Amino acid sequence: MKLTFLGANHEVTGSCTLLEAAGQRYLIDCGMEQGKDVYENQPIPVAPGEIDGVLATHAHIDHTGLLPLLVRNGFQGRIYATKPTAELCSIMLRDSAHIQEFEAEWKNRKGQRSGAEPVEPMYTIQDAEAAIALFRGYDYNKEIELAPGVIIRFVDVGHLLGSSSIEIWVTENGATTKLVFSGDIGNLDQPIIKDPSYLKDADYVFMESTYGDRSHGPRPDYVAELAKILQRTFDRGGNVVIPSFAVGRTQELLYFIREIKEKNLVTGHGCFPVYIDSPLAIEATRIFKDTDSSCFDEETNALLAKGIDPIQFPGLKVSVTSDESRAINTDPVPKVIISASGMCEAGRSRHHLKHNLWRKECTVLFVGYQAVNTLGRSLLEGADNVKLFGESIEVQAEICQLTGLSGHADREGLLKWVNSFEPKPKRVFIIHGEDEVENIFAQTLTEQGFNASAPYNGEQWAIGSEGAVCLKEGTRIRIEHHVSEGAARAATVFQRLLNAGKRLLRVIEHNEGGANKDLAKFADQINALCDKWDR
């Protein structure tokens, strides 16, 4: 059999791998890039019409977002996924298509003034509908024969509702080889969903490495941390804008805010309003509520048994239409605004940033991973100004992050997952990580006795029961991006350090009036850091 690595290699987004085995061709994921590409992408080396099926690990757009384009270009096979993944993709792919059409329309309106050629959307709602019709949803832990010699099974990996690792058994010439694609490995103790399952055997493993170079550290009290952020922002008279992934993270936030309200952890602001300003997040929340309880963890099922909706509470409001969304920023009452997209690359979150970033009393709270070259990453790294809808916006709001709040396992979680295989796989391919992170994690596994490597886009391997051989090296050609003067300055490592210093000053200002004990501890930590690095 043959494996070709097509996307999310030395990058985090755009997952796609081609498996050619037993006379069949399957893609494992078919994801969209989010943020600017780092390395040149490789085209799928076969015509879409010659692909027999797609195996989707989970519903996030960086794993499924190019399925409508694949269908548009001639794919007619089945798309295999868990039942919740199929349900979530039915809304997420429609939403993605809407964004493609909207952005093309906006560019065409703008381009008419300069005589530019019309822009076509990458794909349309009709393409998304056609892709959705090809989905087939399955239960966890059920063996599915795709074709003679190819059997798969979805196993809960605890990243998102419906997320899975995929076990693949390929039988050729009387010999069976087992592959495991990890999908995105979940963090431990997330609300609502179960922890990752651990597998025992595989010949070859293809695993993500998003946080392969770092630890999330001790699990914070997210409810208490979030309550503090809400309290100090509301006390200043500001809004808390939370750019959030519509699926998964939004529902997790609702779970936390329900607990905050139940325990009255934010005082002096009554039944403060919380807006879900994302039609996609609203639909995803409905799917969460309708999902079979077997997909939920014990704590969530215990709440349901008591008649408590774990993601519903007084003051929760939804805005579906554009008019409802715009009205949010005309209301002076301090509020929480949860809006997609989580990396601020599209969607209504960009409008809320435009209206709130320049206000010192407001807070922008990041609650998820921010990929390189995204607006969210720039804000976290201390950008002073950002451009939104053609306007330069000064960053005056407090910028903060719920650290450790992640749907991805950290280094320890990844190591726990891969060390569950006994004996060790013949080879572990490291994918879905930033450039240097993949190299670091591959080296970590090598030091622990694994045969590990981090392929680049376009790399091709022949694998079987007797071993693996690299047939073609991947490309390491970096894409040169035209960047503005401000973006170029921010790209330097030293500038990142300067930006971090500016952010520290803002954090110090935000702590004015805090308890003396906390301020003294904060000062000691800063002085200790200065003593370490003062040269």
Q: Which residues make up each language-model segment?
A:
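Charged, amphipathic alpha-helical linkers/stalks
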Residues: 458-518
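A general structural motif
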Residues: 185, 218-223, 312-324, 343-345, ...
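Short, surface-exposed amphipathic charged segments that create phosphate/polyanion-binding patches used
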Residues: 150-154, 287-295, 415-417, 465-475
